[in-house]
Regions:
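A structural "domain/chain start" motif
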Residues: 7-50, 54-62, 80, 108, ...
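Compositionally biased, intrinsically disordered linkers/stalks adjacent to structured regions
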Residues: 134-160
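Bacterial Sec-type N-terminal signal peptides, specifically the leucine/valine-rich hydrophobic h-region
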Residues: 2-5
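Surface-exposed short loop/turn segments
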Residues: 55-58, 66-114, 118, 122-135, ...
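Conserved acidic
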Residues: 36, 40, 92, 136, ...
């Protein structure tokens, strides 16, 4: 069945043909954190690196001078807003929004391949009664970092 799907032009989302063949080593410095949220830069960067390697097979190169590509990110905004409340008036559901500026450059050809000044990821999450908000928020950020990375890398690979 897989061969028949491949024969008809079917391909998995996130495995598009956009990825430049010369892009073997990519430098991904830690995202700049203009949001003020502690360690968000480290979590997003780590997740983006993991997703980029998994989807493209590139090697992460810490030295920009030896890299074929450069992915820069700046976390502009991080907001958590209550959107639902329990009968006692306590927030039970939150909306988490991360806005970043992202630029991916082909260093071999000196060409910007992807640029988005307001790359936005939104996620909603529940807070169970009696659970500490801070620990729930930290767990939500860990999950959101992975989903953010997946969305960003799919956009890079698909060429949007």
């Amino acid at each position: 069945m897989v061969s028949s799907l491949a024969a008809c032009g079917y391909h998995l989302r996130g495995k598009g043909s956009f990825w430049p063949p010369q892009m073997k080593k990519v430098c991904v410095p830690v995202f700049k954190n203009s949001s003020g949220r502690f360690e968000l830069d480290l979590k997003l960067t780590r997740s983006v690196i993991n997703e980029l390697v998994a989807r493209t097979g590139v090697t992460i190169e810490p030295d920009k001078g030896r890299a074929d590509g450069l992915l820069l990110g700046d976390i502009i905004s991080f907001k958590v807003q209550p959107i639902a409340f329990s009968s006692s008036g306590a927030a039970s559901r939150y909306k988490l929004t991360i806005i970043t500026s992202v630029v991916f450059t082909d260093l071999v050809n000196q060409k910007v391949l992807f640029s988005d000044d307001s790359f936005t990821y939104v996620e909603e999450y529940e807070v169970a009664g009696g659970v500490d908000f801070e620990s729930m928020e930290t767990q939500a950020i860990d999950r959101v970092a992975e989903k953010f990375a997946r969305q960003l890398v799919v956009n890079l690979v698909e060429g949007f």
